[in-house]
């Protein structure tokens, strides 16, 4: 039986670390990459007698995200304790939100697999603290706990079960990431774990109830998420067709083998024994506070796309590609403003730069050259200093070396001769040095002309 005989249901719970300078309940730094256990205090270590103080910036960023994602903002919410034991959770509970989250009932607009507009509903957005991190160490004979991440503020964005394929999941996650970056509440660096997703997948036959779902936790690669969803769809259909019982389980995705493995039964809300956090007051928001955040939201991707099409004359395809990532859109705007040739900057970003990024699996935030250098590359091609072909070689070097385009072409002797009199002198010299080739060409040997052209190119290189 094929996939077409079943319907797929995907739900996503996205955890995005907020870009605050300090943690959610204490003044410890949230900077990534510090030595283990150097950004901790009695509060985030969960020591007895300590009391949390809510970081006001966390609430502001969560409300900002909710507004950007078309949510209703709750004027009366609270924190709750989510109780479970794990070595990287020092208090043995996580301060989160249960029945009264900050944001409810939002949506994101994406395209379905046929290119048609589709709304994916967002059930809720709530704030919570991140856990610590286990570093497995063979020399220690186990795992070492690093609590630098404990207490880093998160928003959890929970979708309704509206997604029907791995492709839709991919587009949803990328659109969500883009929006969070545009409003600057999270850097969404997947390689650092600041944007990760719990992925729930189930299958069922049309007009039948949803099937039991498998959950894969803390996934931080778009490619892996798509592969994991596709595997689960096929494996659950196989299990259904062979009469196996599918249980609600938490699964582990293995990138090497390309399959999932069962870890444990899936927990229910009652397993966490939620109860109100007694050490924190309720979160009361005024309409004026919410409106002030709403009125200061930055330009969103859709608005930028329309502006690029109307003011700069870009095609919808190019405008859509540029605004899909804030880093690319910002690079485009800055470089275009410097050199004045927005269309040429667009062509480089959507073709050769995108190709090199894809080949090197390089996030847009890590493009190693500045807008000034990209603008300089466009300018020296526009004024005839180098050809577009040489420009592609210069671009490759710009990804590897911290040099300006002018420094690169000078170093490699790639400056193109554009003076007609100088070119004429070169041609006359080549003709004078190769009389036999001239005679061969006159005799109908076309290859002789290619030889002469090659000699001229060699001298002008």
Question: Model regions: which residues?
Answer:
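Structural motif
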Residues: 313, 336-345, 385-386, 443-447
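Basic, nucleic-acid-interacting segments
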Residues: 1-299, 316, 337-341
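Strongly charged, low-complexity linkers/loops
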Residues: 365-375, 379, 385-458
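Extended, non-catalytic structural segments that build the interaction scaffolds
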Residues: 289-296, 303, 333-338, 374-386
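Extended, structured, electrostatic nucleic-acid-contact surfaces
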Residues: 302-309
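Core structural elements
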Residues: 192-205, 309-333, 342-360, 372-374, ...
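Generic, well-ordered alpha-helical scaffold segments in large soluble proteins
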Residues: 61, 65, 172-175, 179-182, ...
């Amino acid at each position: 039986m094929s996939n077409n005989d079943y319907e797929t249901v995907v739900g996503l719970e996205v955890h995005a670390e907020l870009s605050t300078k300090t943690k959610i309940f204490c003044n410890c730094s949230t900077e990534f990459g510090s030595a283990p256990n150097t950004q901790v205090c009695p509060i985030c270590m969960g020591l007895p007698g300590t009391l949390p103080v809510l970081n006001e910036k966390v609430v502001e960023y969560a409300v900002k995200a909710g507004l950007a994602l078309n949510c209703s903002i709750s004027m009366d919410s609270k924190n709750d304790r989510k109780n479970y034991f794990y070595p990287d959770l020092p208090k043995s509970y996580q301060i989160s939100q249960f029945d009264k989250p900050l944001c409810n009932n939002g949506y994101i607009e994406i395209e379905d697999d046929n290119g048609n507009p589709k709304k994916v509903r967002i059930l809720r957005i709530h704030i919570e603290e991140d856990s610590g991190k286990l570093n497995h160490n063979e020399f220690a004979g186990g795992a070492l706990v690093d609590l630098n991440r404990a207490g880093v503020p998160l928003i959890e964005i929970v979708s309704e079960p509206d997604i029907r394929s791995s492709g839709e999941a991919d587009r949803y996650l990328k659109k969500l990431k883009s929006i969070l970056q545009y409003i600057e509440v999270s850097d969404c660096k997947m390689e650092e774990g600041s944007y990760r997703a719990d992925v729930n997948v189930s299958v069922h036959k049309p007009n039948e109830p949803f099937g039991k779902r498998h959950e894969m936790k803390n996934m931080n690669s778009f490619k892996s998420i798509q592969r994991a969803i596709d595997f689960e769809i096929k494996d659950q259909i196989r299990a259904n067709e062979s009469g196996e019982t599918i249980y609600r389980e938490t699964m582990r995705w293995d990138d090497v083998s390309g399959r999932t493995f069962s870890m444990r039964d899936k927990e229910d809300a009652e397993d966490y024994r939620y109860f109100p956090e007694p050490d924190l007051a309720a979160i009361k928001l005024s309409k004026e506070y919410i409106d002030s955040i709403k009125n200061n939201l930055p330009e969103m991707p859709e608005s930028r796309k329309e502006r690029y099409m109307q003011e700069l004359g870009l095609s919808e395809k190019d405008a859509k590609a540029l605004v899909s990532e804030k880093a690319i859109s910002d690079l485009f705007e800055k470089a275009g403003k410097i050199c004045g040739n927005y269309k040429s900057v667009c062509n480089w970003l959507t073709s050769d730069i995108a190709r090199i990024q894809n080949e090197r699996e390089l996030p847009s935030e890590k493009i190693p050259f500045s807008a000034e250098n990209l603008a300089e590359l466009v300018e020296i091609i526009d004024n005839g200093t180098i050809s577009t072909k040489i420009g592609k070689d210069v671009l490759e070097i710009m990804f590897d070396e911290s040099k300006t385009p002018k420094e690169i072409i000078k170093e490699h002797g790639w400056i193109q001769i554009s003076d007609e009199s100088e070119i004429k002198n070169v041609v006359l010299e080549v003709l004078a040095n190769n009389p036999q080739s001239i005679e061969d060409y006159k005799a109908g040997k076309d290859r002789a002309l290619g030889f002469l052209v090659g000699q001229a190119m060699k001298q002008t290189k």
